[in-house]
């Protein structure tokens, strides 16, 4: 196995490890404060009232944990996500018959969009966490929620493209083996 493939495998394993850490530990820890799920995983978004209620439920300790632990994990995750999944999507597109640098560009763009939205989401969430709940304005919440919902929507687009690529690979393989 080449050094680049080993590096990509390490990124993929690290991505899964960071994700598992968030899902098994930091997200339940935040939810345990009683205000519901963290902003990052609210697929359908949230409004100003929900955001302020969650920030109040977190209290100072929960907001500090979200800022210093969860958001640090969620800074590592999109970097690892981008490296591992853009490579995987480029490989799937190659197996599906899309040759050349175009497949790499498409893969990178498809994966970069939710990655960049995740970074923007994290910045907006960090801004909310560092304010007193009463000082969090509706515009900031709307922006953070917009980033959250678009991140998940664009990640779903990427998964759909990958699934279509896998379907093309399987159909081509079946066509070659069917008499």
Where are these regions (language model features)?
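Interfacial loop at the N-terminal end of multi-pass membrane proteins
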Residues: 2-70, 133-136
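Interfacial segments of alpha-helical transmembrane regions
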Residues: 5-15, 90, 96-116
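Alpha-helical transmembrane segments of multi-pass integral membrane proteins
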Residues: 113-164
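Structural signal for the C-terminal ends of transmembrane alpha-helices
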Residues: 89-96, 167-173
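Short, charged juxtamembrane terminal tails flanking transmembrane helices
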Residues: 174-179
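Hydrophobic alpha-helical transmembrane segments
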Residues: 4-17, 69-92, 151-171
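Juxtamembrane loop-transmembrane helix junctions in multi-pass integral membrane proteins
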Residues: 2-3, 61, 65-68, 98-105, ...
């Amino acid at each position: 196995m080449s050094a680049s493939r080993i590096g990509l495998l390490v990124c993929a394993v690290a991505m899964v490890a960071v994700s598992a850490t968030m899902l098994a530990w930091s997200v339940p820890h935040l939810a345990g404060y009683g205000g519901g799920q963290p902003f990052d995983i609210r697929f359908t978004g949230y409004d100003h009232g929900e955001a302020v209620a969650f920030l109040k439920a977190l209290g100072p300790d929960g907001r500090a944990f979200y800022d210093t632990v969860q958001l640090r994990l969620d800074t590592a995750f999109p970097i690892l996500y981008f490296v591992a999944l853009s490579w995987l999507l480029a490989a799937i597109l190659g197996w599906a018959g899309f040759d050349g640098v175009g497949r790499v560009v498409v893969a990178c763009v498809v994966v970069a969009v939710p990655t960049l939205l995740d970074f923007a989401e994290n910045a907006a969430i960090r801004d909310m966490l560092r304010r007193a709940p009463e000082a969090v304005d509706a515009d900031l919440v709307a922006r953070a929620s917009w980033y959250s919902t678009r991140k998940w929507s664009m990640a779903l687009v990427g998964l759909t493209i990958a699934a279509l690529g896998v379907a093309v690979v399987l159909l081509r393989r079946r066509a070659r083996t069917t008499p």
